[in-house]
Regions:
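Conserved acetyl-CoA-binding loop-helix of GNAT-fold acetyltransferases
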Residues: 28-37, 174-179, 183-198, 220-224
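Conserved GNAT acetyl-CoA-binding A-motif
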Residues: 41-52, 199-211
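Conserved beta-hairpin
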Residues: 143-160
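Conserved active-site alpha-helix within GNAT-family acetyltransferase domains
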Residues: 53-67, 188, 213-231
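Acyl-donor-binding surface of acyltransferase catalytic domains
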Residues: 23-97, 233-237
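Active-site rim helix/loop that mediates acceptor-substrate recognition in acyltransferases
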Residues: 54-59, 123-146
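Short amphipathic alpha-helix that is part of the acyltransferase structural core
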Residues: 18-23, 85-125
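Conserved acetyl-CoA binding element of GNAT-fold acetyltransferases
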Residues: 11-26, 72, 168-179, 210
Length: 241
């Protein structure tokens, strides 16, 4: 049984052969098979995902891994009645100027991504990926839509969400604020829009938000906004051929 799964979308978008391996128990992980599959399938890059705990240093060396990110998913219980009065406007259409502003914010947000630090992917491809997330929110192929906040006619922040009505979970997929409008409460306004949307347009009971642990401001902001539970800690490594 293969231990590396080929990621078709990532491979196509980034133009290199990319795989992923979920490493649940390093003691039972077959290092020789892992390295054999990399060579046999000519993977240029493999994401290795480890949950809860870091890999031992010796295992990192055996697998030729580099730790690229520590991703935390926090959650909060959601009560619709507390947010029904909030004003919201989930958009699937933006003006050309709004789209360009949103692209710029998304591209600026890309600098914190692990892909941005990965030389096999590069800065421009990472910026293209974050622009794609805006497109995929507007066409509803991944996210539900885009919330924006404007200051003096200019988009100052964007916020993308995804709703799972079956599991009754709302997910944050991207939040970005223009650097010129930091510390003006834009992020809070964006998140409150999504609270209002979910309170009136869904039956969700939980909101989950993944973010990079490297972003200490984001951690503090989550706590401030009521996220009080850590759902998951994910250590993301890259193995390069």
């Amino acid at each position: 049984m293969a231990i590396i799964e080929k990621l078709e979308w990532d491979s196509s978008f980034f133009g290199i052969n990319i795989g992923r391996s979920i490493l649940r128990d390093e003691k039972e992980f077959d290092t020789r098979l892992f390295n054999k599959e990399i060579k046999a399938n000519r993977f240029d890059l493999v994401y290795v995902i480890k949950f809860q705990n870091l890999l031992p240093w010796a295992k990192m060396l055996d697998l030729n891994l580099q730790l690229m990110d520590i991703q935390i998913t926090m959650s909060m219980d959601f009560t619709s009645n507390s947010h029904k009065g909030l004003i919201y406007n989930l958009k699937n259409n933006l003006t050309v100027e709004e789209i360009n502003d949103s692209y710029k914010i998304a591209e600026d947000t890309a600098v914190v991504s692990r892909f941005y630090k990965e030389n096999k992917i590069g800065n421009q491809k990472t910026r293209d990926l974050y622009r794609k997330w805006i497109d995929n929110a507007l066409n509803k192929s991944f996210s539900d839509g885009v919330f924006i906040e404007k200051v003096s006619g200019k988009v100052a922040g964007v916020h993308l969400i995804k709703t799972d009505n079956i599991k009754k979970i709302g997910m944050f997929t991207l939040t970005g604020v223009d650097g010129n409008f930091k510390r003006m409460g834009i992020g809070r306004k964006l998140w409150l829009q999504s609270f209002g949307f979910w309170a009136n347009e869904s039956d969700i009971e939980t909101i989950k938000s993944p973010f990079s642990f490297q972003n200490s401001e984001s951690l503090n902001f989550h706590l401030k906004m009521g996220f009080n539970k850590i759902e998951e800690i994910k250590y993301i490594y890259h193995s390069k051929n």
